[in-house]
């Protein structure tokens, strides 16, 4: 039986493919998960993560952007983008404990991050996002979280 870590690992691979232009990934996701021996509850979990990230992609990117410091989102490695998007989705839209989410993202960063400092970078971005989001836990979108972010950065909404 697959673990949630393996499910997340499969999801970042599919998000990477989606980011490269394979927009039909959602249609073949279940068969890809089957091939990776991710079945039943873990398959449902993985599929819901993939579907959720894709559905909320623009909001997720908007929420991540302020924490990239000098980096532009488009200049990040594809796998780093996928890991940040998955982690941000889970922080913003699920009930999973934040330390679990961040730890999973960091561990995936150690395996798949293109840079040696990818795990540290992922940890910093997701931790900062989670702290801002905690101030507005029930936000359906990132608008209130974005207001908090802008306030912290001294920007106008």
UniProtKB/Swiss-Prot annotation:
Any single GO BP term: transcription antitermination
Keyword RNA-binding: yes
A family per Pfam: NusB
Family membership: Belongs to the NusB family.
Taxon lineage: Bacteria, Pseudomonadati, Campylobacterota, Epsilonproteobacteria, Campylobacterales
Gene3D superfamilies per UniProt: NusB-like (1.10.940.10)
GO CC annotations on file: cytosol
Entry keywords, A to Z: RNA-binding, Transcription, Transcription antitermination, Transcription regulation
SUPFAM superfamilies: NusB-like
Transcription among keywords: yes
Gene name tied to this protein: nusB
Protein name: Transcription antitermination protein NusB
HAMAP family, per the entry: NusB (MF_00073)
Single GO MF annotation: RNA binding
Task performed by this protein: Involved in transcription antitermination. Required for transcription of ribosomal RNA (rRNA) genes. Binds specifically to the boxA antiterminator sequence of the ribosomal RNA (rrn) operons.
């Amino acid at each position: 039986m697959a673990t949630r870590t393996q499910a997340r690992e499969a999801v970042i691979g599919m998000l990477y493919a989606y980011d490269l232009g394979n927009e039909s990934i959602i249609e073949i996701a279940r068969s890809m998960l089957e091939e990776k021996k991710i079945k039943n509850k873990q398959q449902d979990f993985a599929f819901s993560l993939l579907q959720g990230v894709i559905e909320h992609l623009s909001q997720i990117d908007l929420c991540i952007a302020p924490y990239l410091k000098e980096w532009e989102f488009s200049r990040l490695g594809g796998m780093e983008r996928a890991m940040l998007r998955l982690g941000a989705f889970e922080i913003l839209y699920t009930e999973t404990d934040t330390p679990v989410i961040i730890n999973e993202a960091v561990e995936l960063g150690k395996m798949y991050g293109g840079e040696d400092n990818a795990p540290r970078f992922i940890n910093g971005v997701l931790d900062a996002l989670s702290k801002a989001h905690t101030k507005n836990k029930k936000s359906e979108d990132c608008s209130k979280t974005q207001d908090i972010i802008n306030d912290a950065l001294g920007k106008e909404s």
